[in-house]
């Protein structure tokens, strides 16, 4: 438990650092205006509103499956960011990728916290409280110090490339060594079928449009107009 308690919470803190902190440095270094860079604060909304979809992780699949699924998606997203980071014309696409990453990473956090509660009894949970916080903080410091420095000195494709590689290592470690500790009530594919049904899809699209209109209507032009 000492090993996976560290790696899972490192894997929780590292994407958060990439999305909430390092993205700001990246966009500023890419020539985006300070006002437009302030839009990166909206990436934190996923962690605020994750309670809306967090219950689905209890009813579909297992926390381990959700953990692996979201980690795998994060690997793909940051590989795409790596390939796009050195191209100024791709900055809107990178911004969209960071938004997608924020939703996936917040879900990933929920899966990790849930797995921790499922895999350990109360005594074990109490024993690792400080330990998992330490792992999370180390990940945050690694991102803020090492990745930012690497991006400034060697270029952001290199920095995000290292980030993608590290996330890939964590994914495969958890895939092969993270123990199973619960039975799923319903498969994840049942949730996917439910979400793509017409009524749910309409509600989802309307919600996204409404959220985008409220939050971005007055500021999206500032972001696009500041691109080099």
Language model segments and positions:
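Intracellular juxtamembrane helix-capping segments at the cytosolic ends
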Residues: 23, 105-120
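Transmembrane alpha-helical cores of Major Facilitator Superfamily
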Residues: 10, 39-45, 72, 99, ...
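Intracellular loop-helix junctions on the cytosolic face of multi-pass helical membrane proteins
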Residues: 85-93, 122-228
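Hydrophobic core of transmembrane alpha-helices in multi-pass small-molecule transporters
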Residues: 10, 77, 89-108
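C-terminal ends and interior cores of transmembrane alpha-helices
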Residues: 68, 72-89
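Helix-to-loop junctions at the C-terminal end of transmembrane segments
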Residues: 48-62, 151
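Helix-loop boundary and gating motifs at the non-cytosolic
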Residues: 1-47, 213-226
């Amino acid at each position: 438990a000492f090993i996976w308690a560290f790696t899972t919470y490192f894997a929780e803190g590292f994407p958060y650092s990439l999305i909430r902190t390092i993205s700001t440095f990246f966009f500023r270094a890419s020539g985006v205006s300070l006002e437009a860079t302030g839009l990166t604060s909206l990436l934190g909304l996923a962690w605020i509103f994750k309670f809306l979809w967090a219950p689905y992780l209890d009813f579909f699949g297992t926390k381990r499956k959700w953990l692996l699924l979201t980690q795998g998606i994060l690997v793909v997203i940051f590989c795409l960011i790596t390939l796009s980071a050195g191209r100024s014309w791709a900055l809107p696409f990178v911004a969209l990728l960071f938004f997608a990453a924020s939703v996936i990473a917040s879900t990933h956090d929920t899966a990790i916290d849930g797995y921790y509660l499922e895999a350990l009894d109360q005594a074990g949970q109490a024993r690792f409280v400080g330990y998992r916080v330490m792992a999370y903080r180390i990940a945050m410091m690694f991102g803020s110090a090492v990745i930012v420095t690497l991006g400034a000195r060697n270029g952001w494709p290199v920095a995000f490339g290292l980030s993608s590689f590290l996330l890939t290592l964590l994914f495969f470690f958890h895939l092969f060594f993270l123990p199973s500790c619960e039975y799923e009530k319903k498969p994840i594919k049942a949730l996917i079928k439910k979400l793509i049904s017409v009524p749910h899809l309409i509600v989802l699209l309307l919600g996204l449009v409404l959220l985008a209109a409220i939050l971005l209507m007055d500021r999206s032009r500032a972001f696009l107009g500041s691109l080099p």
